[in-house]
Regions:
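A structural signal for small-residue-enriched, beta-sheet-centric alpha/beta enzyme cores
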Residues: 1-88, 92, 98-403
Length: 403
């Protein structure tokens, strides 16, 4: 497997575009995105667990109940959530796009992201669709820009992999800076592949993958109302269709995880106001469930995230987060170290502090990517979670989000 360019357009038969249609006030910001497959594709998705769900999720879930999709449309700037006519608007978006592409409206995945509780006017979307469709091409970047809200960085990736003797491609784009806390979904992620795989196996692969990828990110502890991860697989690579578990399915799952884990890191690093990516790596867990609980609890701790912003090696906040994680852990066996490109330093062993240089620790924690290495001493299970530091800018961004 090798990393390639192209994002969601790396796979055969997929094109994309993004335009400004007028939902967002800033005319330099794209606010409407499209991904299109030249043939119908197997489709799968996972959705937010928030009881308050955006209308687009309801429409998408109904549309791809048969496991087929051919296009994805997403607007940014308005979440189309808690609106009396939300379902009607999301359904109309599918119809307008279906008419423009000459495909069935129920072959469309629809998504929205932005402010909750404000009416979404269909007119700018209707006016923008002709340019959106007319500009379809190798424009993964434009589509990525079209789904961004408070994101600072574009998030896209693609890989090439051999499956069943054929060269397959898989790529994805994502948005998500705030409201990142699972369980699924925690952001918008759109993945495309030309691998031939049944919708049932595609759903199985995605549902399993999110447990160790997107469900292991936390930016601010809020679970979004709108977000989802969707995958379209159009089969144009020509491999024998994957319909059951086996070597080809395992290879596909590895490729899918390469995409999702890369996007996870990018999302965590681009947390609202973030200056540092935090990666908590837990080893020696009694089982994976306990290891995940520990890793997730640490990256969710506001006190610890604030300490990382200040480059303060306050390992006590790590143990505190482990203690309330709900994991079955023997604290007297816990070890903690901090690592970055500047080096590594142990700060805790056997559940107690060890002597270390505060100056050396600060050098390590001043880097923009920090690893928190935790050993539990209870077994062989491992887990990784991602987050970011908590900065002044997070409050500034969210204090005036609607303006």
């Amino acid at each position: 497997m090798k990393q390639i360019n192209g994002g969601v357009c790396a796979a055969k038969g997929f094109t994309a575009n993004g335009v400004h249609c007028g939902i967002r006030k800033n005319k330099t910001k794209r606010d409407l995105a499209l991904i299109y497959s030249e043939v119908p594709a197997a489709a799968a998705a996972v959705y937010t667990t928030n009881l308050v769900k955006g209308a687009p999720l309801t429409v998408t879930k109904n549309n791809i109940a048969n496991g087929v999709a051919q296009a994805m449309i997403c607007n940014s700037g308005n979440a189309n959530t808690c609106n009396a006519n939300g379902i009607e608007i999301a359904t109309e978006m599918c119809k307008l796009l279906g008419d423009a592409l000459d495909i069935p409206a129920d072959n469309v995945i629809v998504a929205s992201t932005g402010v909750i509780g404000q009416p979404l006017n269909i007119e700018p979307i209707a006016n923008g669709i002709p340019a959106l469709v007319g500009g379809l091409g190798d424009n993964s970047l434009y589509a990525c820009e079209g789904i961004m809200t408070t994101d600072v960085k574009v998030k896209e990736i693609a890989f090439e992999v051999e499956i069943g003797g054929k060269t397959c491609h898989i790529g994805g784009i994502a948005k998500g800076s705030g409201m990142i806390h699972p369980n699924m979904a925690t952001m918008l992620v759109f993945v495309t592949t030309d691998c031939a795989i049944s919708s049932e196996m595609l759903q199985a692969a995605l549902s399993e993958d999110v447990k160790s990828s997107f469900n292991m990110i936390s930016i601010d502890g809020d679970t979004s109302t709108n977000d989802m991860v969707s995958v379209m697989a159009n089969g144009l690579a020509g491999n024998e269709t994957i319909t059951a578990a086996g070597a080809d399915f395992d290879t596909f799952c590895e490729a899918l995880h390469a995409v999702t884990s890369y996007l996870c890191r990018m999302i965590a690093a681009d947390g609202e106001g973030a200056s540092k990516l935090l990666e908590c790596v837990v080893s020696g867990g009694k089982d994976e469930h306990n290891a995940k609980k520990v890793a997730k609890s640490v990256v969710c701790s506001s006190l610890f995230k604030a300490a990382m912003f200040g480059a303060d090696a306050n390992w006590g906040r790590v143990l505190c987060a482990i203690g309330y994680s709900g994991a079955d852990v023997d604290v007297t066996k816990v070890g903690v170290a901090f690592a970055s490109k500047a080096g590594e330093i142990k700060v805790c062993e056997g559940g107690a502090g060890v002597e270390f240089s505060e100056e050396r620790a600060k050098e390590i924690l001043l880097c923009d990517e920090i690893q928190i290495l935790i050993t539990l001493g209870d077994g062989d299970a491992k887990a990784t979670a991602w987050g970011c530091d908590l900065t002044y800018d997070y409050v500034k961004i969210n204090g005036d989000y609607r303006t």
